[in-house]
Amino acid sequence: LFIMADQLRWDYLSCYGHPHLKTPNIDSLAKRGVQFESAFVQSPVCGPSRASYYTGRTVFSHGSTWNQVPLPIGELTIGDYLRQSGIRTGVVGKTHMRPDLEGMSRLGITKDTEIGLIVSEPGFDPYERDDGLHPNNQIKNSKKTLSYNEWLNKLGYDGPNPWNDWANSAEGENGEILSGWRLRNSNKPARIPEKHSETAFMTNRAMEFIEESKDKPWFLHLSYIKPHWPYMAPAPYHNMYSANEFYPVHRNDTERNNDHPVYKAFMENSISKTFSKDEVRNTVLSGYMGLIKQIDDNLGRLFKFLEDAGHMEDTMIVFTSDHGDYQGDHWLGEKELFHEQSVRVPMIIYDPSEHANKTRGTKEKRFIEAIDLLPTFLDAVESPVSKHRLEGNSLMPVIKGEDPKNWKDFVFSEIDYSFNEARKILNLGASDARAFMIRNNEWKYIYYKGFEPQLFDLKNDPDEFNDLGRSKDHSKIREEMKELLLKRIIDRKNRVAATDEFVTKERDYTKDDGIMIGVW
């Protein structure tokens, strides 16, 4: 059971230290499993981050570099790997994947065929596929209407798009509709009760999938749409939390005056300007925290369902997020850059097997990355791991309490910000808006194509306020981190059509075929 929340910051759970936002059900999962303290995504953007989770490959390896960029048809995903082992793989909720229509057309594959459905839904059975952003009633890249809307219509919520008009809108004092798209309404209750919300609906559908699959091996990706915007929570979650329970805003004037061109462009884009206002932050956080609390309560329902069905003792459960949320920290909104608020995520893995008894309830400080999950899943079901494709490492040795040799001592992330307003501010070409992060325990180094780097001393400046990208005293450190980044990029696995064993075995094919090269 692979559970993902959308845009959930690592530090907005009580088990990760939030003093006021209590998440007892997620905490209970951590007590039964391993809580990873240093988990990072391959890109702090929904689509590319998820594509890395699903493929076990870094962003510029799999090629889905932003939300609107399709995952190439040749990329294998969780569903493709596990299906070979006879495991039903389903998704309930969001994947943010776009079908590679050009690649499908080239191969003569249409979406109305079985293989067309598989390659359109990154290898998953789309049991309840819903990416959660529906200004109209049409599912993007599909002729289908939203099943959540059909369900709401049957419950009596009228109109062609109750997702927009009921579930993600509030009601004013005079009965007027207040749109959830407007951040000013984020602390008002949605027009539906909690039991009819997206989060409750997705939890129900997850339980239905598990019930249907109980007699055969299954893998379910339960991908909650929230706490991603619209930040519209049903009562009583909409105003559970007030300003004295929010984290203090995390920014200072040194950052505001930083004239690094890319960072400055991100601070100047319209989203960041909005979230940098205290009024906006204090309004939005009420809904954001309420949506997280609602997810935790629904996970309590789900875990009880698993307990009652006897599945809590035979189901591996992973809980994580696709990226964080700045919420005005560092003078930024949304995500996309590489501060901890954006690129770091919660990661909890519960393995019911006896081999995991040694690590139950532990907090693991080793670095892990999103790309490590797919090899972990394959390892857990004893399925072959495609080492020539997968760029992550199985976490099973860590879960078993072993001490794996040569474990990674840094993490890597990257962005293609060509779709962001910042590219236009900088007047960059579509292929020039790229940035790469390498982070170890002491330093965080960020390389920007065409611009000077950034460097942060995490030991002495854990808040990431003081940019040392131009410091003469740190030129040697910058060169060392750049070399580390180069090594990581060089180590990408791009020869995906041939295994290392094939290369080794076939290297003398010319002699075997009677071909003579360089013979006197």
List each language-model region with its residue ranges:
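Formylglycine-dependent sulfatase
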Residues: 1-448, 453, 462-483, 511-520
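An exposure/low-complexity boundary signal
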Residues: 496-520
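Short alpha-helical linear motifs
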Residues: 246, 337-343, 491-496, 503-507
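A contiguous, mid-protein "functional segment" used to position or interact
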Residues: 472-501
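Residues forming the ATP-binding cleft of Hanks-type serine/threonine protein kinase domains
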Residues: 459
